[in-house]
C-alpha cells in the first residue's frame, strides 16, 4: 500500500499540472472569443489539454479504488481537479464542430467517442484533433479565425440548461450575434421567456 500510495500521489501531482494548463488554455480561448480573434489553434490547444487531463484523471481511478479508505483525501483531490471536464469537452465540441446550425446529439456523441478512442500519440498532433471536429488540419490553417456557437459562454451563466442554449444557438447562429442581441430579441428564441432573456443578457454582460 505504501508504494501504491506514493504512485497515486505522484499521479495526482501530474493531474494538478494538467489542470493548471487547462485553466490557462481555457482563459486564453475565452478572452480570444470575447475579443473576436479566436483561431483554430486556440481551440485545439484547449481540447488537447482537456483530453490529457481527462485521461490522466481516469488512470488514477483504479489506483484509488484499490487503496480503498486510505485514499479518501486523494479521492477528494482528484474530484476537485477533474471538475466538470467531461461536460467542458462536450461544450467545446458543441461550439466548434463543423456542421450547419445546431450540432445534433448523434454528431456530438460520435465526436466524443472518437476523441475517447484517439491513441495517445495522436492526441499530441493538432491535425488528428482538427480532423475529428472537421476543422482545417494543415499547419497554415491553424491561424484561421473561428467563431464559437456560444455553448461554453452560455453554460457559464447560472441555471441556463443545454436545451435553452440549443434554442438560442438555433435562433442566432453564433456567439457574436447572441452577444449583440437585446433581451427582447433573445426572447424570440423558443422556450426563452422575457425573464430568462434578461437573465441571459445580464449574464453575458458580466462575462464580457
Question: What positions do the PLM features span?
Answer:
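Long, charge-dense, solvent-exposed interaction surfaces that engage phosphate-rich ligands
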Residues: 38-41, 45-58, 62
Amino acid at each position: 500500500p505504501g508504494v501504491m500510495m506514493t504512485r497515486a500521489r505522484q499521479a495526482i501531482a501530474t493531474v494538478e499540472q494538467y489542470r493548471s494548463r487547462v485553466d490557462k488554455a481555457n482563459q486564453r480561448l475565452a478572452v480570444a472569443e470575447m475579443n473576436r480573434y479566436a483561431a483554430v489553434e486556440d481551440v485545439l490547444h484547449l481540447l488537447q489539454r482537456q483530453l490529457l487531463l481527462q485521461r490522466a484523471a481516469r488512470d488514477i481511478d483504479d489506483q484509488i479504488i484499490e487503496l480503498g479508505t486510505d485514499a479518501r483525501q486523494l479521492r477528494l483531490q482528484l474530484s476537485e481537479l477533474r471538475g466538470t471536464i467531461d461536460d467542458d469537452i462536450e461544450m467545446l465540441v458543441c461550439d466548434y464542430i463543423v456542421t450547419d446550425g445546431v450540432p445534433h446529439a448523434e454528431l456530438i456523441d460520435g465526436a466524443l467517442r472518437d476523441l475517447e478512442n484517439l491513441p495517445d500519440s495522436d492526441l499530441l498532433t493538432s491535425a488528428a484533433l482538427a480532423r475529428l471536429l472537421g476543422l482545417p488540419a494543415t499547419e497554415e490553417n491553424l491561424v484561421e479565425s473561428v467563431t464559437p456557437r456560444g455553448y461554453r459562454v452560455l453554460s457559464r451563466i447560472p441555471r441556463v440548461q443545454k436545451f435553452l442554449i440549443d434554442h438560442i444557438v438555433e435562433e442566432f447562429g453564433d456567439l457574436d450575434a447572441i452577444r449583440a442581441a437585446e433581451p427582447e430579441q433573445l426572447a424570440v428564441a423558443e422556450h426563452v421567456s422575457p425573464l430568462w432573456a434578461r437573465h441571459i443578457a445580464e449574464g453575458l454582460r458580466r462575462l464580457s
